Amino acid sequence: MGSATPSRLQKFPATAPADEIYAAFKEDGCVIIEGFVPPDQMARFSQEIQPAMEKIQVQVTNDGNSNDRVKRFSKLVTTSPTFRHEILENDLMHELLQRVFSKPGEGMGYHFNDTMVIEVQPGAPAQRLHRDQELYPWWNSMGPDAPECLVNFFCAVTPFTVENGATRLVPGSNRWPELTLINATDCPQYGKIDSVPAIMQPGDCYMMSGKVIHGAGHNATLSDQRRALAFSTIRRELRPVQAFPLWIPMQIATELSPRTQAMFGFRSSTQHCDVDTVHFWGNDGKDIGEHLGLISSA
């Protein structure tokens, strides 16, 4: 049985070698990367989405719902030029995702599942502990040695503190012998799970496996809105939460780099099967980007 008492969150600067960050991720299932997004980029991004955030009504439900006093906004790529031209062009993110999802010679083995701003309001209750891979219910049943299905980069837009609801993580829960739902019926450790708060400054992020137990903390402040930017990525074989190509206008898509176009589903990925090459999300055996008239990424 895995330990229910984590000791720490490993931290690395964004300038650290990707192999070192990835090794910590493999060990604990989560790792903090300091300076993942430059603070000036994050400040401009926050300003650009502010009008949209102000239009979202706060729900007060008191029923354990994950949206209780939490604002969520996903139309980032169409709202923020800084997001689509700068933040998305994060080479370290791709270096790490290549190590998690991709095989040599097969291009990107991953795409975006969702990109979202999550703002925890004053008084918001703690979120129930969960694993993100519960989105794909069968994945837990494959155990800790299964390939990753989902990796989240969760970035601080405003400071993350214990008081304002910093995410609480359970390092090492990715390696528990049984990956279960976190409830009294399914989880032997239920009620005995200790967690570690992800204390971060704007621009820092934690990279987290879909296998790791976590949940937003209680925002006990009177006025502090804890804002985060989350990149949820999944292996290319899985269907994403967001139907990006159906609501991102082509005018916006053509502004994106070929790499980012692929992340949002405007280009195909390839896999070599014996002697054949398969295009995922393709068009009659060809890259969907050709059908859309996008400039070749070659």
From Swiss-Prot:
Keyword entries, A-Z: Dioxygenase, Iron, Metal-binding, Oxidoreductase
Residues the record marks as site: Important for reaction specificity: L150, S232
Domain of life: Eukaryota
Cofactor: Fe cation
SUPFAM superfamilies, per database record: Clavaminate synthase-like (SSF51197)
Consequence of substituting L150V: No longer produces preaustinoid A3, but yields the B-ring-expanded berkeleydione as a single product
Protein residues bound to substrate: R72, Q127, T167, R226
EC number: 1.14.11.-
One Pfam family matching this protein: PhyH
Protein's UniProt keywords contain ATP-binding: no
Chain positions recorded as Fe cation binding sites: H130, D132, H214
GO biological process: austinol biosynthetic process; dehydroaustinol biosynthetic process; terpenoid biosynthetic process
InterPro entries (alphabetical): Phytyl_CoA_dOase-like (IPR008775)
Catalysed reaction, written as an equation: preaustinoid A1 + 2-oxoglutarate + O2 = preaustinoid A2 + succinate + CO2 + H2O; preaustinoid A2 + 2-oxoglutarate + O2 = preaustinoid A3 + succinate + CO2 + H2O; berkeleyone A + 2-oxoglutarate + O2 = preaustinoid A + succinate + CO2 + H2O
Pathway(s): Secondary metabolite biosynthesis; terpenoid biosynthesis
Molecular function as annotated in GO: dioxygenase activity; metal ion binding
UniProt subunit comment: Homodimer.
Misc remark: In A.calidoustus, the austinoid gene cluster lies on a contiguous DNA region, while clusters from E.nidulans and P.brasilianum are split in their respective genomes. Genetic rearrangements provoked variability among the clusters and E.nidulans produces the least number of austionoid derivatives with the end products austinol and dehydroaustinol, while P.brasilianum can produce until acetoxydehydroaustin, and A.calidoustus produces the highest number of identified derivatives.
Domain comment, as recorded: Residues at positions 150 and 232 are important for the type of reaction catalyzed, using identical substrate. Both ausE and prhA accept preaustinoid A1 as a substrate to form divergent products through dynamic skeletal rearrangement. AusE (containing 'Leu-150' and 'Ser-232') first desaturates at C1-C2 to form preaustinoid A2, followed by rearrangement leading to the formation of the spiro-lactone in preaustinoid A3.
Family membership noted in the UniProt record: Belongs to the PhyH family.
Protein's recorded name: Multifunctional dioxygenase ausE
Organism, scientific name: Emericella nidulans (strain FGSC A4 / ATCC 38163 / CBS 112.46 / NRRL 194 / M139) (Aspergillus nidulans)
